[in-house]
Each structure stands twice: as C-alpha cells, then as structure tokens.
Design a protein with these regions (language model features):
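Beta-sandwich interaction modules
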Residues: 105-120, 226-228, 248
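Short, exposed beta-strand/loop patches in secreted or surface proteins that constitute
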Residues: 59-62, 88-89, 111-116, 130-132, ...
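Short polybasic amphipathic segments
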Residues: 86-88, 130, 202-207
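Short, hydrophobic/aromatic-enriched beta-strand segments in well-ordered soluble domains
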Residues: 236-244
Length: 318
C-alpha cells in the first residue's frame, strides 16, 4: 500500500508515494491506494462467437431485477457484411444465456464503446453514436429481448417570454448533443417573429400547444419567421424550434469514460476521457427530470492545466 499518496506525476519517475500512471489502482476502505491483485482469464460459460470481430466494450450489471452482460464488437477488417454488434446475455441459475443480438447498432466501425447505466437504463456511447438499450428487441425463445435506439437529444427552451420582435428571458442552456433550440413568444397579433442571430433554420412550430405543419416561412438573412396567419395574442403561446449552424456533439462522442454522482440519487452523469483536462456532466430538463440526453454547454469542470488530461474519476463515499 502507498501511504501517504503523493499524487499523480505523469512522465516522470517520481518520488515514493507518487504515481507515474494512474492505472491498476483501487481505493481501500481506509482511503489509501493499493495495486489491484491482477487478472486471470476465465472460460466464458456460454456461447460467444467473436470470429472476425474485435471486442470494443464490455459491461456487467443489473437492469431491474436481472443481471446482464453486454459485449460490443466491430469487425477486425473492413466494415461491410461483417458489421458491428452488441450481444446481451442474462444470468440464469445455470449460468449466462443469450438475451439479444443487436446487429449494426451504430452502423459504422467503432474504435471503442463504453456502456453505463443512468436512471435505471443502459446506454452505449462510442465514437460513432450514442444509444439507449431497452427491452423489446430481438429475443431468444424464453428470454425478453432488447433493442438499441439512438438517444434523442433533449431540446432546451433557451428563451422564454419573448415578443415577436425578440428579447425575452434566458432559461435553459443549449444542449451539446444537438443544434436544436426552442424559444417561446408571447403573441401580440404580429405575423413576423425574429429569431436569435445563431438561427439558420426552423425545425418545428407550435401555437397554443398544437404542432403546425409549415404554417409560415423563414428568411435566413433577416432571421425572421413569418406566419401566413398571425397567431392570436397570448402569453408564451408560440414556440419555435430553430436550428443553429453547429453543435458540440462530437465533444460528447469523444468521451471514453463515465461516472455517476450527486448524492444518493445519482442525478448527474459525468463524462471524460477525450484527452483533455475537462469533464462534462448532464443536466436536468425543464420538467425537473435528470437526463442522459441533456449536456448543458456550461456544465463542465476543468482540472489543472490544459496539458494535464483527466485519466480517472472516482466516486468516494455516499
């Protein structure tokens, strides 16, 4: 055991108590660092075919009352007929049994996949996409199956109480996962509604809670949306979902590691591991629900200098 811990000093031999690489350590009950005892190969107690495939990610844990193992693979060679897979196994009394085979979940050759659970659901994040794995997909004869679906990014309400001429009050932060943002207006009988400077298009329009199919047109140069029939006056009764030119989605998909935190409820998901000194974390939607589909742009923590990438996060206690 190392006592006391002198910290991490990468690229140097260091003094006693300092670690040159933050790998293969675990924390004891006394808060000390100790080396892990090592690993040994075990024969898998179930059929698992990896011919032509490379394992890109593994996860084991509980979903509901069941214990599962998830394995992500992608082809060792070119991506073609031999695509990527996620295989899910359920533990039974006699051992693990196949629960699902999810072919081409990312639709591209992955370099890595990290699995994590958040609010009782299983997610798979990779350099090629972000998936939520849930019941209802391909299944075996006697075992409930699973399906992998792309995580639908939460669209934040960034401005509320705006007049058709603009203004309003800032509410939610933009979501790194998407270039979509919402703004609500209090109609005054006008037909023309000015959008923020970042708007390059309009994706959806609601009036008094009803979604309308192309009720007007958007002029990208003036950033004005014009209704063919002006909405009736009201308070926050017009909502326009607009598009920004870009998003920070690639930053999220570059995070290889995760940790959950926030007391007993674990309402925050922290992502890190893109080679920077920054970790980002999820937020809470307007309705008050924690969401793995919402990473507010300002929810980040920078540690030390830019030349000191984060190599590990640990939830300690609680």
């Amino acid at each position: 055991k190392i006592r006391p811990l002198g910290g991490l000093r990468e690229g140097a031999r260091g003094e006693r108590g300092e670690a040159a690489d933050m790998v293969n350590f675990t924390v004891t009950g006394q808060g000390l660092l100790t080396l892990r005892p090592g690993v040994r190969a075990l024969e898998l107690p179930f059929g698992f075919d990896t011919r032509g495939q490379v394992i890109r990610g593994l996860w084991a844990g509980f979903l509901g009352r069941g214990e599962f193992l998830a394995v992500a693979t992608s082809p060792a060679g070119e991506y073609g007929a031999n695509g990527d897979y996620i295989q899910v196994f359920r533990r039974k009394e006699e051992g693990f049994a196949a629960a699902a085979l999810l072919p081409r979940p990312f639709g591209a050759k992955t370099a890595w996949v990290q699995f994590f659970t958040f609010c009782g659901e299983l997610y798979a994040l990779s350099d090629q996409g972000y998936l939520r794995i849930s019941d209802g997909g391909i299944s075996t004869v006697d075992t409930p199956g699973f399906r992998a679906q792309a995580v639908e990014a939460y669209v934040p309400l960034v401005v509320t109480g705006a007049s058709p001429a603009g203004g309003g009050t800032a509410l939610e932060q933009v979501n790194r996962l998407t270039n979509r943002r919402r703004i609500s207006y209090s109609a005054d009988g006008s037909a023309a509604y000015r959008l923020p400077e970042e708007a390059v298009g309009v994706a959806a329009v609601q009036v008094s809670g009803e979604s309308l199919d192309s009720p007007g047109s958007f002029d990208a140069e003036s950033r004005v949306y014009t209704f063919r029939t002006p909405p009736a006056a009201g308070t926050d009764n017009v909502e326009i979902t607009y598009l920004a030119a870009s998003s920070d989605r690639a930053r999220v998909l570059g995070m290889r590691c995760s940790e959950t935190y926030n007391g007993d409820t674990d309402t925050r998901l922290f992502l890190y591991g893109d080679g920077s000194n920054t970790c980002i974390y999820s937020g809470v939607t307007q309705g008050g629900a924690p969401s793995a589909a919402y990473f507010p742009a300002m929810n980040e923590i920078r540690v030390d200098g830019a030349d000191a990438p984060i190599t590990g996060l640990l939830r300690h206690g609680g």
